[in-house]
Amino acid sequence: MPSTKTQVSRRLTILSTEEIDSLFGMPHFTEGERQIHFELSPVEQATINSARTITASVHLMLQLGYFKAKAQFFVVSLEHVRPDINHILTRYYPGRVMSEVGQLSKPTRLAQQRIILDLLGYRQCNGDEKQALISLAQRSAMLSTQPKFILREVLEHLSNQRLVAPGYIYLQDLVSQAVTDEHKRVTSKLNAALPANLQLSLHTLLHADDKIHLINVLKHEANDFSNKEL
């Protein structure tokens, strides 16, 4: 779903900066979290051992640990992830040092992503999967046009189907389009079913001063992803 100027202009603000980082940003592990996310199963260990260089091994382990935490892939700066690399070297490659680890080429990075998807039973969200997301967002919007509700339904579907989530901007456009389409659908049905005088009264009610009309007092965005708020 490529973004156009029209899409950008009607793109809804769904999550705060902190929420976006929590869901889609690179993990920032504590030492305890490193112990958990960089733990390797026998199959994972064998896969890491098959890498030809220390650079390839460390990057594969990094991305595997990050994917376990976020189900996302990241392009990393070595200096930015130095604490994670030091943990991996100390734990799995005693005697090796940070200066031995270089950057990966893009083809190798993409090849490692495919390896991780196979190891963990995930798939990229492409083609038919994205069409299914569009349909799901449209159905969800028929239940509620609150953007956070629709986004949560989409993210739950991706998790249940073990699909790598598209980027946040894509999901933002997806939800925004679903809300716009649902508003148009409901408006069209109302225009077809209601006399002109009732249409005018309804329009006035929905756009009146919030301080006067309870219907607008009750209309608000959910504060978070809890069931109570949604």
What are these regions (language model features)?
Residues 2-230:
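Long amphipathic alpha-helical coiled-coil/heptad-repeat bundle
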